[in-house]
Amino acid sequence: MPQLLQNINGIIEAFRRYARTEGNCTALTRGELKRLLEQEFADVIVKPHDPATVDEVLRLLDEDHTGTVEFKEFLVLVFKVAQACFKTLSESAEGACGSQESGSLHSGASQELGEGQRSGTEVGRAGKGQHYEGSSHRQSQQGSRGQNRPGVQTQGQATGSAWVSSYDRQAESQSQERISPQIQLSGQTEQTQKAGEGKRNQTTEMRPERQPQTREQDRAHQTGETVTGSGTQTQAGATQTVEQDSSHQTGRTSKQTQEATNDQNRGTETHGQGRSQTSQAVTGGHAQIQAGTHTQTPTQTVEQDSSHQTGSTSTQTQESTNGQNRGTEIHGQGRSQTSQAVTGGHTQIQAGSHTETVEQDRSQTVSHGGAREQGQTQTQPGSGQRWMQVSNPEAGETVPGGQAQTGASTESGRQEWSSTHPRRCVTEGQGDRQPTVVGEEWVDDHSRETVILRLDQGNLHTSVSSAQGQDAAQSEEKRGITARELYSYLRSTKP
């Protein structure tokens, strides 16, 4: 640290060493000022231990008449002592600064301290120029002490001469230049602090305005997403119950869609990531709603049961997508996950994923909802002949069973079977179905006999079982029995 700054720091430390701090105010009382004059200024003040000297100094320094001396008032004393030492050193470099200064202070203490008080106050108001004056006083004080002491006389004179030469050569220009930048800096600091406080106040005032805007924007985005979701949700009346069940299995539903078709899931993932799991749950809800729009109450039960069989559904979707999803892919790309989930709903029933549910509930709700859904969807690929072949077994055994009822209800136009009395209507459907088959396959009496003989011999049972499996084979055996009855009836009616 330079010598000048060290002197300034010494002045500050001397004031703090004797001053008393009360709250935010640090000041010198009369007793503390007396101790400071006795210990620090005893070499330059006449009768420093005299109470009258202390009272006179306190009266001259105390501007606000508080009975204490603050730091800026203490700088007046420092400035006056420095000014007296500087005058003495300027007049005679060899003179004793202490003796001359003592005489001057003793003879006209009031006048000089008054002038020093005014000038020091001006310097104190100007800014940090006080420190420079105080440093010169400190240096002059050291010089005076060096002159009073024999061992340090040369050094003190050298120091004093250095100060004299510096002040004589540079005059007041450098001191003013040094003072003015610091004054400007202090003013800028105060302005900066004030501006900073103003900015903080403005910032604190502006933040509540920005936060609502941000929250409103966030709410707007969230509202847009929610509106999109709610727009999809309001397509059916029985949506709420179905969506509650499907929302618990959102993760499984997303896995099904990803395993079903990779090409369609690209658009679905881009659309679904913005809406997170909620949109997937809503989409799953749509799939279930669209699958069961014609039968509202039975569809809810079917969807609740099918949600427990999500694992098997994902596997079946891969198998059945190649066959029937081609037409649905072209139509369902605009609908993203909705059309896929609808197709997935149909495929689950076709592949027999509801077999366990059918065994538990029999023909209560699954046969109703499943039959009507399949009937309306499965006739599009044009596989009605296949369902006609499986249509003879009883209602309790066929959903691989529901498929048989679907074929019958689709071709004969009896959609009321699956919603009223499935067992009895299937029995009636067998009576209605056989003339339809006979009308398609029998051409004349000779062909009738041939077909009947083949049914008796079991050849048709063998060909059908190779295509349809064990369930279809059993149904063809029952058809053969029915054909014998028809044959006996026709033989009895021949002329």
Swiss-Prot record:
Expressed in the basal skin layer (at protein level). Squamous epithelia cell-specific. Expressed in the esophagus (periphery of the cells of the granular and the upper spinous layers), foreskin (granular and lower cornified cells), scalp skin (granular layer), inner root sheath of the hair follicle and in primary keratinocytes (at protein level). Expressed in the squamous epithelium of the cervix, esophagus, foreskin and larynx. Expressed in the fetal bladder and scalp skin. Expressed at very low levels in the lung, kidney, uterus, skeletal muscle, heart and fetal brain. The keyword tRNA-binding does not apply. Residues 137-151, 226-242, 307-324, 374-385 have a biased composition (Low complexity). Pfam families: S_100. Residues 49-84 form the EF-hand domain. GO terms for biological process: cell-cell adhesion; cellular response to cytokine stimulus; positive regulation of cell cycle G1/S phase transition; positive regulation of keratinocyte proliferation; positive regulation of NF-kappaB transcription factor activity; regulation of gene expression; regulation of phosphatidylinositol 3-kinase/protein kinase B signal transduction; response to heat. Promotes cell proliferation, G1/S cell cycle progression and induces expression of the cell cycle regulator CCND1. Regulates proliferation induced by pro-inflammatory cytokine response via activation of NFKB1 and PI3K/AKT signaling pathways. Homodimer. This is Cornulin.
